[in-house]
A protein has these predicted regions:
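Walker A/P-loop NTP-binding motif of AAA+ ATPase domains
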Residues: 2-192
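Active-site phosphate-binding and catalytic loops of NTP-dependent enzymes
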Residues: 25-33, 131-132, 239-245, 266-275, ...
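Short conserved motifs of the RecA-like P-loop NTPase core
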Residues: 107, 182-197, 209, 225-226, ...
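Soluble catalytic regions of large protease machineries
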Residues: 46, 249-254, 261-418
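Residue-level signature of catalytic and energy-coupling elements of molecular machines
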Residues: 17, 42, 59, 155, ...
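Short active-site segment of divalent metal-dependent hydrolases/proteases
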Residues: 103, 258-260
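AAA+ ATPase "lid" subdomain C-terminal helix
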Residues: 193-225, 232-240, 261-273, 343-349, ...
Length: 418
């Protein structure tokens, strides 16, 4: 049984680290091939993805004595500690130096290639070049680190750990649920889709938060509804204070969110993981969560669909209520940003709107005019979509007014009933 079994998911990364770990554990096997031990590996990625856990598993699997360095001392003392630690590791023989949160050794807000902490790390690695010292590091942002430190011969492998997605996210949710007392109605697939691209730490927090809801209500099991409430809190900071009164504001919010749902579902069926029109205090009266495979858009069609989805709430409100939607500020801003990227950076409508360096007033005006023109076209497409699917829109609106929150399955049942 491998020590890496403690880590849920990340099978590709674990396989690579197990292979490297074998070189560290059994150098003689590789010496016969003329292969030398890699000098070091860096794991980097967003906070909470499990970098430190993966590093600890590597150390345990290797069986080597380890020396840990992290920024828990004043700058001057840290430099001395770095030098002393590498010297101790070299004297030990076969050892691992673990640099935890390496990007925090100096000012992590900017790139400081000449920071004395990084110079000390580089010098330490170089002094151990002909020894059996292996260097393992974690970092949130590798781009804060100097290129000279990241080069081969110092860190031969720089591996990104991303937030779990798809099957990996499902495995993580199921793992955390297995440690709690829950009912069998919890759909781990749905929760994983809702929490797509969030860290393992976020997933753990959601499951724990759901347990708090259950405990406070005096129940002995976590339900799917508890999980949805916890997701709402984590993703959108949705407050608990809601009004039970179906007033004009609640109606506008329900229609607005229903517009997002209709557009998203017609453009890509099954893409809405949940929608809520809880009448929350503040500008955000509701939320519609749309599942995407990637955090970036890979085609013009994905840009088009994104913009239409964003404008569909405004389109639905103004179609059904007959008034200007005053709660669509964030939607409009995000839609404009996507349209500006299409027009400018991606030259989707020609190269004459591309900005390279300082743009002239004439170019800016031309670009703004084209963006506005395209945005009007997108808005008309959004209005057409919600108008031609009024029955779907009305049924989602009615369901939101009654239940406030709808899951993917409930949205599917509404659509199938039409």
């Amino acid at each position: 049984m491998s020590k890496f079994d403690k880590v849920v998911g990340y099978e590709d990364i674990k396989a690579e680290l197990i292979r490297i770990c074998d070189v560290v554990k059994n150098p003689e096997k590789y010496d016969r091939l003329g292969v030398h031990m890699p000098r070091g590996v860096m794991l980097w990625g967003d906070p909470g993805v499990g970098k430190s856990l993966m590093a600890k598993c590597f150390i345990e699997e290797s069986g080597c004595k380890s020396f840990t360095i992290r920024k828990d001392k004043p700058d001057g003392d840290l430099v001395n500690a770095i030098c002393d630690t590498f010297a101790e590791a070299k004297a030990e023989g076969r050892a691992i130096v673990f640099l935890d949160d390496l990007d925090k050794f100096a000012n992590e807000d900017e790139k400081h290639p000449d920071a004395e902490e990084y110079v000390a790390v580089q010098a330490g690695i170089d002094t151990c070049k002909d020894s059996d010292v292996f260097v393992l590091a974690t970092a949130n942002d590798k781009y804060c680190l100097p290129d000279s430190l990241l080069r081969s011969g110092r860190f031969d492998k720089v591996i990104e750990m991303e937030c779990p997605k798809g099957e990996e996210a499902i495995k993580v949710v199921k793992y955390y649920l297995s440690q709690k007392k829950s009912l069998g109605d919890i759909d781990a697939v749905e929760i994983a889709r809702i929490m797509s691209s969030h860290s393992c730490a976020d997933l753990e927090t959601v499951v724990n938060e759901a347990g708090i809801y259950a405990g406070f209500d005096g129940r002995d099991s976590i339900t799917h509804q508890d999980m949805l409430r916890a997701c709402m809190r984590m993703l959108f900071d949705a407050p608990e204070r809601v009004t039970d009164e179906i007033n004009s504001y609640a109606m506008v919010t329900a229609v607005h969110e229903a517009g997002h749902v209709v557009a998203a579902e017609l453009l890509k069926q099954g893409s809405v993981t949940f929608v809520s029109a809880g009448g929350y205090i503040g500008e955000t009266g509701g939320v519609t969560n749309v599942f995407t495979e990637n955090n970036y858009k890979k085609s013009k069609e994905e840009f088009d669909n994104y913009i239409i989805r964003k404008l569909a709430g405004k389109a639905a409100t103004e179609t059904v209520i007959g008034e200007i939607d005053v709660g669509c500020k964030a939607d409009v801003r995000q839609a404009f940003q996507a349209a500006e990227k299409l027009v400018g950076d991606l030259c989707a409508y020609g190269f004459d709107t591309y900005e390279s360096g300082d743009a002239s007033e004439n170019l800016r005006a031309k670009k703004e005019q084209l963006v506005a023109l395209e945005m009007n076209k997108y808005y008309q497409r959004a209005k057409k979509l919600v108008s031609e699917n009024r029955e779907f829109l009305d049924k989602v609106t009615d369901a939101l007014l009654k239940k406030r929150t709808l899951t993917q399955g409930e949205i599917k049942r509404i659509r199938d009933s039409i």
